[in-house]
Amino acid sequence: MIGRPISAGKGEGKAVILKDAFSFLGGVDPRTGELSVATGSAGTSIKGKVFIFSKGRGSTVGSYTLLDLKKHGNQPSAILNEKAETIVATGAVMANVPMVDSLDLSLFQEGDEVFVDGSTGVVSIAGVKESEVVTSIIRRGDRILLLKRSDKVGTNRGKWAGVSGYVEPGESPEQAAPREIREELSIDNFVIAGRADPIIIRETGHIWTIHPFLYDVEGEDVSIDWEHTEYKWLPPSEVVAYDTVPGFVKMLADLRLL
């Protein structure tokens, strides 16, 4: 994944994650590198770790606390934020700690082995594969097509979904979506009616970037392939009662179907 470079350099280590905003002043002991009681993670060391928290807060003295951590050899190997602010960014630069922001922090889990390039903004997680896929919602009148995934597919077996598939190398999401529809439903008479911003989902060893599309069909029935066992045409409001793949209901909302 790629965020915004804040402080140059490379760092790696196990993730230590705080859900709330963090102040280095009073939040960590520079002499030990251990977090304080106020953080809710008292005694946890950030020394040599990739320290992940939403944003900084507190006094500008916090910048010097980060520098003090470095003087004691207890600085984190890197810092990741959702949104950087001046105090932490300044401290990271002063202490030569690689830092990246503009990341979806929900994709990280405590103890992940994380690699950070603060010069390019590239961040990766060891053992976690990243894939780009498309999901197309097929609409006919006031109903949408819901497909049950078979036991032969690699993920989310038995769950209900739209028409989904990988974006192949050299292919754009706009090219992948209609190709998957033709392959999985054996139809050609469809027109694009909308699209939404990508959704990024973390499952244990996988990060999925999902590109949602909406296509309209008129009167044409479908012929499903081996990837699905059955299908239903339903009003979008009824989909919430089904066991759908992760992010599916959000896709419907983003496509303004709910």
Tell me the role of every PLM-derived stretch.
Residues V249-L258:
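Charged phosphate-binding loop/patch that engages nucleotide di/tri-phosphates or the phosphate backbone
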Residues G3-G11, V16-S124:
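Feature captures the catalytic cores and cofactor-binding loops of soluble hydro-lyases/lyases
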Residues I187-D197:
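A short coil-to-beta-strand element that immediately follows conserved catalytic motifs
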Residues R140-D142, P198-D221, K232, P236-S237, ...:
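Active-site-adjacent beta-strand/loop module that shapes the phosphate/pyrophosphate-binding cleft
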Residues V128-L145:
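Conserved N-terminal beta-strand and adjoining loop/helix that marks the start
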Residues R143-I187:
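Conserved Nudix-box catalytic region and its N-terminal flanking loop in Nudix hydrolases
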